Amino acid sequence: MTDTNPENVNNSKITIICSAPDLASQNIKKHLLALREWKPLELPENSGFSAVLESADGKFRLVDIEEIHVFQDGLDKKLEAAGLPAELIIFASKHRSKEEVKSLTVHCTGNSSNEARLGGHPKELAVSSPPAMKSILMEMKRLAKVKGLDYDVTLEVTHHGPTELNVPSLYAEIGSTEGQWEEPVPGEIVARAILTVSLEKVPTAVGFGGGHYAMRQTGLLLETAISFGHNFPKYQLEFVDEALIRQAVEKSNAEFAYFDRKSMKSADRKRISQILEKLGLKVLKESEIREKYGREE
């Protein structure tokens, strides 16, 4: 549950977390500092944070940490204890992939299986922010086109930590190698996209199937009025049980579900459909989503 203390609610800000050892994080931070006026805030002793800045318009906080992002379980409580309650947590981060694809990515966090090697807890999902993920990804896409940046702009599936967060959160990333992490143009694009974030409610789905980069879900997010919360790729579906789906629906505030049908085994489709029916969620086909929710201009 998020804190309902009026003082904390009024003081809650969109909080951007920048990690000292993360080159992309520092690149994004440099551009955030250049794009807005910021004032330093005093930190209480032993807060665990290196520095905190607040934007002159009072909308954002920028928090420096010395550790990497994925192990920041309980960060929302730590921020609150330091008098810095968050309305939304955005991890400005690098993305690494074996394929070394140049990319700008957005995703929420969670562990579908009993493994939690990269932070978080097994079988636990963080609270997602579908409106924020949509607005940031759409602005990344727009700016990449304007600036002629030939990067993939994509939604990733739910993965890694932190998961122990009751405040909505997301990752905004530059991928996938050191060369890209320090490039000025991607850093500026991610920073600008973060600063245009919207929390206005949008029709939201949970997604099942597809690969790590959730291509069909990305297309629907960019081309219609909907967004996605948690997404589970085809290679994780064996771990997706009723408890995890219930978590995904609740922590995405989802109204319906979407299947990348061709990528899913029929047994998984049937099993997950039955669970969703029990939870009162319809599965909409891509054609139904496009017809009902139209296209973004």
UniProtKB/Swiss-Prot annotation:
Protein name according to UniProt: D-aminoacyl-tRNA deacylase
Function: D-aminoacyl-tRNA deacylase with broad substrate specificity. By recycling D-aminoacyl-tRNA to D-amino acids and free tRNA molecules, this enzyme counteracts the toxicity associated with the formation of D-aminoacyl-tRNA entities in vivo.
Alphabetized UniProt keyword annotations: Hydrolase, Metal-binding, Zinc
One example GO MF annotation: zinc ion binding
Stored InterPro entries: Deacylase_DtdA_archaea, DtdA
Subunit structure and binding partners: Monomer.
Gene3D superfamilies, alphabetized: AF0625-like
Gene giving rise to this polypeptide: dtdA
Signal sequence, start to end: none
Catalytic reaction annotation: a D-aminoacyl-tRNA + H2O = a tRNA + a D-alpha-amino acid + H(+); glycyl-tRNA(Ala) + H2O = tRNA(Ala) + glycine + H(+)
Provenance organism: Methanosarcina acetivorans (strain ATCC 35395 / DSM 2834 / JCM 12185 / C2A)
Source lineage: Archaea, Methanobacteriati, Methanobacteriota, Stenosarchaea group, Methanomicrobia
Recorded superkingdom: Archaea
